[in-house]
Design a protein with these regions (language model features):
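Short coil-to-beta-strand
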Residues: 85-97
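Structural preference for beta-strand elements that scaffold enzyme active sites
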Residues: 41, 90-92, 138
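Short C-terminal domain-edge/linker segments immediately following a structured domain
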Residues: 72-77, 91-92, 124-129
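Basic/polar, cationic surfaces and motifs that engage anionic cell-wall
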Residues: 1-36, 100-205
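N-terminal catalytic cores of peptidoglycan-degrading enzymes
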Residues: 1-87, 156, 199
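Weak global preference for isoleucine
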Residues: 62, 68-71, 93, 116, ...
Length: 205
């Protein structure tokens, strides 16, 4: 777990502000990604900490009430240690919470409905600003990235389909994504649900 930040280090933003930040950092992120022979990515995480507890490793953070925060001035090209061997040219978005989560039980501080919607709205806003298609190749959970499900093979797999070292957001504990099922193809995996919601917000903004 990374360094905890005080609330005073964070700035609450709207989706419009997040979209503008994405546009402002579109080229720097694209250049950084190109140097690694890949496209700009959005990686979706949970912090494995508590609601209201901010961390230094994530560009965008979403609290239990769905409020969206950035660190300081929101520098999206800051290199944070969020996603192993994938941090250059990427933006990390994290839900605050999920301390003690297991593949059987998401614990006392699971993703809230407001957080899930906030995450989808944040992903849609950033994808708009960065000119990204919302698909698994560009917008994916840490668990999906850990198993190289986007086809970018920069490390050995360590996600929910293999070692389960990282499985962030593989399931959400909701009716849409009720259980840990990393091989599911019915749209119930957490990443599929979040991308679907992000697409909806993109179309209805």
């Amino acid at each position: 777990m990374s360094a905890v930040l005080p609330a005073s280090a964070m700035r609450r933003v709207t989706c419009r502000e997040l979209r503008l930040l994405g546009a402002a950092y579109r080229l720097p992120l694209a250049y950084a990604a190109a140097r690694c022979a890949r496209e700009t990515k959005l990686y979706l995480h949970w912090t494995a900490g508590h609601y209201g507890q901010f961390f230094a490793d994530y560009h965008v953070q979403i609290d239990a009430d769905g409020a969206i925060y950035v660190i300081g001035d929101g520098a999206l090209d800051a290199l944070h240690a969020a996603t192993y061997r994938r941090n250059s040219g990427s933006v990390s978005i994290a839900l605050l919470g999920c301390v003690g989560a297991t593949t059987e039980d998401l614990g006392a501080e699971p993703p809230t409905a407001a957080q899930i919607e906030g995450l989808a709205m944040a992903a849609a806003a950033l994808a708009d600003g960065l000119w990204l298609t919302i698909d698994k190749e560009r917008v994916l959970t840490h668990g999906e990235a850990a198993d190289n499900e986007d086809g970018v093979r920069v490390h050995a797999p360590y996600g929910p389909r293999t070692t389960c070292e990282r499985w962030d957001l593989e399931y959400l504990g909701t009716a849409e994504s009720p259980v840990f099922a990393p091989w599911a193809e019915d749209g119930t995996r957490g990443g599929d649900v979040i991308r679907g919601k992000a697409q909806w917000y993109r179309q209805h903004k």
